[in-house]
Amino acid sequence: MLWLLRHAEAADGGPDDERPLTERGIRQAEAAGRALQTVGANMDVCFSSPKLRALQTAQLACAPLGVEVIVDRRLAGEPFDLKELTAGQGDVLLVGHDPSFSLLLHDLTGAQARMKKGGLAGISKGELLVLLRPTELSAIAGQRVA
């Protein structure tokens, strides 16, 4: 299973690579991790963009899952070779940015969907199985992010 998690809400201003999550973004990332835990998602590894907002999202979401976060520059926003990145891995969580993730979602599944900040997609064998907004993730996690 391939999971795509778009970074949660980040602060405006400052250098793009260094924008941290807002308080709301922190809650969104924590909710994503709890929701994944609640549904029994089993990731072998998490790859994250090096941009601060994505890395913080990955660390917060992966904490309850006990999954290692590996920083990979290919997820910083440009198109990347998914097969090369995930070769030899089982179930993978990628944490990154749009428009790359929405384009990847379309390329893999044909879905015409745009991922929201803090949104999660689950893909298996070219089929989009899950597409959740942050509010839906927080409901699954049993917490409020607003």
At which residue positions do the language-model features occur?
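Active-site-proximal alpha-helix that buttresses catalytic centers in soluble enzyme cores
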Residues: 1-79, 87, 112-115, 119, ...
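Residues that scaffold the ATP/ADP-binding catalytic core of kinase and kinase-like folds
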Residues: 14, 104, 131
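Non-DNA-binding regulatory cores of transcription-related proteins
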Residues: 87-119
